Amino acid sequence: MGIKGLAKLLSDEAPLSLKEVPLSHLHGRKLAIDASMAIYQFLIAVRSGGPGGQNAAMMLTNADGETTSHIQGIFNRTIRFISEGIRPVYVFDGKPPQFKSGELLKRREKRLKAEQALKAAEESGNIEEQDKQSKRLVRAGTKENEDCIKLLTLMGVPVIRAPCEAEAQAAALARSGKVYAAATEDMDALTFRSPVMVRKMTFANASKSDVQQIFYDKAIEGLEITHDQFVDLCILLGCDYCDTIKGIGPKTALKLIREHKNIETILKHLNREKYVVPDIYVEARRLFNHHEVLPDNEIELKWTECQPEPLKSFLVDEMGFNPDRVQASIEKLQKAFKASAKPQSRMDSFFKVKANPEGDKKKAEKRKAELAASRGKGKKGKGGGGFKKK
């Protein structure tokens, strides 16, 4: 889930922290990719139409009926990364923290509701609803993870098994300088203090070539708060470890943090009869600030040439992929790896950018004003001049 509403809040309050760039802009960068998030996205996106086009889209499978959508997605996308000169390292989730059990229970309840809705849609023949509910039932299990670990190892791409949350481990890799950024859709990578976060890296739609970079320092600066206050803000917004306070939205949460500095002081000024405050926010704060990750000295990132024959055997014999297409892709991978192995410098390494805090502040204020103006125009003509509920 990540942090509820944080992306929108940064867009409104700290627009300079967000930057859309083409994938090629990351040439020469090492990126720690949230593997579970990537696998989930490909399980949903890489699908085939039902027989005769009369049934809901289905995930790709091999002759034994085992799902292969995630394998095709990770294989093709990783080749694309390496072709762009990017060095990916995939980080897999370990055991979830105990205080995430509440969130996991909610997810199980949602899955049960989706199963019931899917059954009803199948009985009524509603294809659109079948597709919608089947996507809600998708999850990456142990087998999908192990399949991808085997694939990536044969491709020569490093894999890390995090002791706990993948986003926390990816953020730690970025903080230590072993990689440039944590690549995930979960905004809590910023709460774990990744200097740079990259989103949309594993979108399966090839036409969506742009990725989004989010810069931690500029986010903190734009929000006008400290890191400790940012952690408390994320807890108030709602995270995997702690429910949000119902009735307090992102804007109000930011206002309260700016005014009172921390959750403890906010609680002293909050009407406890009106607002229900989760009692585990202290533990949630501890998890964000002291999450279990592998020590830097235990991590060695090494990219190697792929193992052509074992890789082809895995994809063709086990996954049921087309031999000719697999061979062509392996040759493309080998060519991309050799090209990326040559010493190359990024263009921005030739230039030293002079900091201009005052200029950045003016840009941020201008951007905020533009956003406010555009929202104001959108509200004209609405009945009574009120807000439109979504």
Curated annotation (Swiss-Prot):
Pfam families assigned: XPG_I, XPG_N
Region (N-domain): 1-111
Annotated EC: 3.1.-.-
GO biological process: base-excision repair; DNA replication, removal of RNA primer
Binding-site list for DNA: R47, R77, E165, G238, D240
Basic residues biased stretches: 376-390
Residues where Mg(2+) 2 binds: D186, D188, D240
UniProt xrefs under PANTHER family: FLAP ENDONUCLEASE 1, FLAP ENDONUCLEASE FAMILY MEMBER
Keywords of this entry: DNA damage, DNA repair, DNA replication, Endonuclease, Exonuclease, Hydrolase, Magnesium, Metal-binding, Mitochondrion, Nuclease, Nucleus, Phosphoprotein
Co-factor binding details: Binds 2 magnesium ions per subunit. They probably participate in the reaction catalyzed by the enzyme. May bind an additional third magnesium ion after substrate binding.
Name of the protein: Flap endonuclease 1
Chief location category: nucleus
GO CC field: mitochondrion; nucleolus; nucleoplasm
Basic and acidic residues composition-biased segments: 349-370
Co-factor requirement: Mg(2+)
Any GO molecular function: DNA binding
Family to which this protein belongs: Belongs to the XPG/RAD2 endonuclease family. FEN1 subfamily.
Protein role: Structure-specific nuclease with 5'-flap endonuclease and 5'-3' exonuclease activities involved in DNA replication and repair. During DNA replication, cleaves the 5'-overhanging flap structure that is generated by displacement synthesis when DNA polymerase encounters the 5'-end of a downstream Okazaki fragment. It enters the flap from the 5'-end and then tracks to cleave the flap base, leaving a nick for ligation. Also involved in the long patch base excision repair (LP-BER) pathway, by cleaving within the apurinic/apyrimidinic (AP) site-terminated flap.
Post-translational note: Phosphorylated. Phosphorylation upon DNA damage induces relocalization to the nuclear plasma.
Chain segments carrying region I-domain: 129-260
Classification via InterPro entries: 5-3_exonuclease_C_sf, Flap_endonuc, HhH2, PIN-like_dom_sf, XPG-I_dom, XPG/Rad2, XPG_CS, XPG_DNA_repair_N
Cell compartments where the protein resides: Nucleus, Nucleolus; Nucleus, Nucleoplasm; Mitochondrion
Subunit structure: Interacts with PCNA. Three molecules of FEN1 bind to one PCNA trimer with each molecule binding to one PCNA monomer. PCNA stimulates the nuclease activity without altering cleavage specificity.
Annotated positions binding Mg(2+) 1: D34, D93, E165, E167
Residue segments, region Interaction with PCNA: 343-351
